[in-house]
Amino acid sequence: MKRNSANIEWTYGAIPFARNETHDKVIEMMDKEPRGSVLDVPTGTGILAERLRKMGFEVSCCDINSSFFSVPDLKIDIGDLNQSLPYPDHSFDYLVCLEGIEHTENPSNAIREFQRIMKKGGKIFLSTPNFLNIERRIRFLFTGTFSKIPSHEVIKNIWKGDLAMAHLSPLGYPLLKFIMECYGFRILRLEKDRAKPKMVWLLPLVWFIRLYGRFASQKRKEVYRLDETTRDEIILGGNTLIIMGEKGSEG
């Protein structure tokens, strides 16, 4: 299969775990950055890593499970985001974590490890399901959950007991931003994977929520991060939220 993105042509034979639109958006964002060392974790099939390498980045791949990895001329390291990653301090200029943080038992540990192994001023590109778009907020109202809960039969028979396949930590953007800032990251940019045209029917509800935020007290705005959760990239965002951050001097 061939596809053109960021002025390069690449070929692959596997299926990306993250949405194609998420891969394409991250490639577009990273194409504007100076070339350097990048860690792709969890790398999954290695498709994104292959694209980044063809763009001129020095790529390292890491995942808790190597059985899905399908890029023969790239090496994969085994690492668990809930524990210490197998890299020295200050190893990477960039870190890409697509659809991984919500699968961890301890997302704070993962962010702390990212901070440790990245160089000062390094850029992080992190994606996670957008649990706070208006569509998912309505779903939560009726179901009481932001993410589907797998059955024990699925975990046992299909996932072979691997809980890391489930969304163990479905984090909304305010909490994820809070954790990242606690470990010295500064948020630079938010992106969505794609627009969802059917959300136009939910615009009246979005306007009502924004009106509530406008007249809320300053304290309420701050503690609930209302200015952040009502911005277009989140409340009108797609299925996936893409966060670009930078490691500061702290930590």
Per-range role (PLM):
Residues 1-3, 248-251:
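Short, Lys/Arg-enriched, disordered terminal segments
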Residues 6-21, 25, 47, 51, ...:
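S-adenosyl-L-methionine-dependent methyltransferase catalytic module, highlighting the catalytic core
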